[in-house]
């Protein structure tokens, strides 16, 4: 949508995402209750039980239509060598959690490096960070890796779970409602997804 706006094809667009976890969570619980489940099957299936459900919509416009907040730009990278570390379907998700965490952090570090090079990011000039809502271990490792202050973020995974791609805009919306985002803030939105894919975006509030 942002590309279409910049190319002059449209003036405004709506980006929508919805995540529903009930089906896969219930199917996973049924599988884990079977008598033939061993520790390996449990380990691969357990992350599914952390999923949540939610929906978001974001309106993007040309600067002529709105001056409130600005999407400055983004950087992204993929590392498809690790595409098999998380495999999902409507009925099952299998996750090699430790390997996924390690590979995801490596990709995040490279993507952050692009942000430093092309967007001028560093640990002192980003005012607020909204990251992918997976869990406390992932957050701590990511913030330590970049030298970021965890007081400059907000998390929703303890109450909403991991709502996939919906997590970042959903968490941002709640942070705004709670008055955590101030005018002039440089916001960094950091998403890491299975594939592996990583996208980091800056918004000037």
Regions from the PLM with identified roles:
Residues 1-9, 105, 109-112, 127-205:
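Claisen-condensing/thiolase-fold acyl-transfer catalytic domains that form or cleave C-C bonds
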Residues 12-14, 56-58, 69, 128, ...:
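Structural motif
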Residues 6-29, 79-83, 136:
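Acyl-CoA/ACP chain-elongation machinery
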Residues 119-121, 179-180:
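Glycine-rich helix-loop-beta junction characteristic of Rossmann-like nucleotide cofactor-binding loops
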Residues 34-106, 110-113, 192, 204-205:
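Condensing-enzyme catalytic core mediating Claisen C-C bond formation in acyl metabolism
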């Amino acid at each position: 949508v942002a590309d279409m706006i910049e190319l002059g094809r449209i003036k405004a667009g709506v980006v929508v995402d919805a995540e529903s976890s009930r089906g896969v969570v219930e199917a996973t619980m049924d599988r884990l209750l079977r008598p033939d489940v061993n520790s390996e099957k449990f380990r691969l299936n357990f992350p599914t039980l952390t999923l949540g459900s939610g929906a978001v919509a974001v309106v993007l416009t040309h600067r002529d239509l709105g001056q409130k907040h600005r999407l400055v730009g983004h950087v992204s990278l993929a590392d498809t060598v690790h595409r098999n570390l998380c495999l999902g379907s409507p009925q099952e998700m299998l996750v090699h959690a430790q390997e996924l965490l390690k590979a995801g952090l490596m990709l995040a570090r490279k993507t952050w490096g692009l942000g430093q090079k092309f967007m001028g990011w560093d640990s002192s000039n980003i005012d607020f960070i909204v990251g992918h809502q997976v869990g406390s271990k992932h957050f701590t490792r990511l913030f330590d890796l970049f030298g970021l202050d965890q007081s400059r973020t907000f998390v929703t995974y303890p109450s909403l779970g991991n709502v996939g791609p919906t997590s970042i805009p959903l968490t941002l919306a709640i942070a705004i409602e709670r008055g955590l985002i101030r005018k002039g803030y440089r916001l960094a939105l950091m998403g890491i997804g299975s594939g592996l894919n990583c996208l980091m975006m800056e918004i000037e509030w």
